[in-house]
Amino acid sequence: MINMRKTHPLMKIINHSFIDLPTPSNISAWWNFGSLLGMCLIIQILTGLFLAMHYTSDTLTAFSSVAHICRDVNHGWLLRNLHANGASMFFMCLFLHVGRGIYYGSYLYKETWNIGVILLLTVMATAFVGYVLPWGQMSFWGATVITNLLSAIPYIGTTLAEWIWGGFAVDKATLTRFFAFHFILPFIIMALAVVHLLFLHETGSNNPSGINPDSDKIPFHPYYTIKDALGFMLLLLVLLLLALFSPDLLGDPDNFSPANPLNTPPHIKPEWYFLFAYAILRSIPNKLGGVLAVLASILILLIIPLLHTANQRSMMFRPVSQTLFWILTANLITLTWIGGHPVEQPFIIIGQLAPMPYFLLILVMMPLAGLFENYMLKPEW
């Protein structure tokens, strides 16, 4: 009998993607984050679906419906804690996945990389609209501050902001449409992830050495399925520890108070995974300038493939580029730390200085380091 997984039209696709897929034999644990992101997405969609069954997107009842889920729904507290902390795990994996792509030169698969950047933006949009749904103080004021940035766009800004709000301020119409967006976007992310995989499998996976691995490939199953399963277990362990022992560790205490348009929290800040962008936004005194800087900080990823000057793909054997990469990582951690602090000295001056090395490192220093490393590899040395 002919093996069904190799002949059946549907099984054939799964076989070529997850079973008989030729994979480089030397890919490290840094390549686990793609599958971990897939698992995070499935967890978020499933927990989100059950939460949506009990949530009401109305300004009068949204906050109490979340309290009702946690108190009265069977395991509702667990669903909510898994969903809220699942978002943190999602972004942790995302940042590590993007960092791995930059370090090992995976961005040279341009189509895969560009779809990945679009995915990052879509996930950020989903997380933002999702954070508004519990209708706590920080949800409301976060939505007000961020959507109000649209009014910085010349000519059409105010009209655009009011169109998004569905009125003259963040209110019932805004909450209803944000719930609709938050429900549909994960399915769009799922479709984009399939396209991301499609482009990846056109070229095959990159590997730590950055050289062509065609001479030494192994089947994906059982080697990498077992490796991914270990990653799944570790991620689930961390997520469950977080959701069961310290579910509010990464949240904001202000969000335990219902939204009050007449009372501004002392310090408005987003979730931890947006703090780096928030720090860049606050670093520029001009409203439009801040918006453009935040957009540039994410969209700069799209031009990274064009800035690759090194003869070697990976940073594995490029110590100067490695040093700059880790300085960039430290810079992003600094920005995240600054974004979580109130606007007062010394945080103001650090916040104004920190975005400069971020852009300088990506646009100037790393391309120059690549050229320098090429020069040092010349035979006369």
From Swiss-Prot:
It is found in: Mitochondrion inner membrane. Keywords: Electron transport, Heme, Iron, Membrane, Metal-binding, Mitochondrion, Mitochondrion inner membrane, Respiratory chain, Transmembrane, Transmembrane helix, Transport, Ubiquinone. PROSITE patterns: CYTB_CTER (PS51003), CYTB_NTER (PS51002). GO terms for molecular function: metal ion binding; ubiquinol-cytochrome-c reductase activity. GO terms for biological process: mitochondrial electron transport, ubiquinol to cytochrome c. GO terms for cellular component: mitochondrial inner membrane; respiratory chain complex III. The keyword Mitochondrion applies. Heme b b566 binds at H97, H196. Heme b b562 binds at H83, H182. It holds the Pfam family Cytochrom_B_C. It comes from the Eukaryota. A ubiquinone binds at H201. Binds 2 heme b groups non-covalently. It is a multi-pass membrane protein. Its cofactor is heme b. Its main location: mitochondrion. Heme 1 (or BL or b562) is low-potential and absorbs at about 562 nm, and heme 2 (or BH or b566) is high-potential and absorbs at about 566 nm. This is Cytochrome b. It comes from Dasyurus hallucatus. The gene is MT-CYB.
